């Protein structure tokens, strides 16, 4: 069974390592340390038998939120881990009075786009050359 809990400071190194396995343009260790310390950001980790298999961060400012980062270990994908993380992040947002949630996703990331659409996210814009490698991003939004 996957355990979802709040990020702790000691999780940051493992999160940064998993980030490198999941993304071609990973956040740095310093980025994650900043996210954990930020008063507007909530981070969650997913654990399988104590092993870090996923994480997600959401930044909440007044009635808006941004899913800043969400990732699942390649070995644990298609098992509902990403869905559970996103559910918990959205629950956190609702509990804090958020009305709109935004996120960016690579236009080539069909599995993530499908997950987000399943939660009701809609594409509202395209951010041209958003990623360091020049790939576009969809800006997606969800009204809570």
Identify the role of each PLM range:
Residues 2-4:
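Extreme N-terminal starter segment of soluble prokaryotic enzymes
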Residues 73-75, 79, 107-109:
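Active-site acidic-Proline motif in GNAT/NAT acetyltransferases
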Residues 78-91, 114-118:
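Conserved acetyl-CoA-binding loop-helix of GNAT-fold acetyltransferases
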Residues 99, 106-113, 129-144:
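C-terminal "cap" of GNAT-fold acetyltransferases
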Residues 116, 121, 140:
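Conserved active-site tyrosine of GNAT-family acetyltransferases
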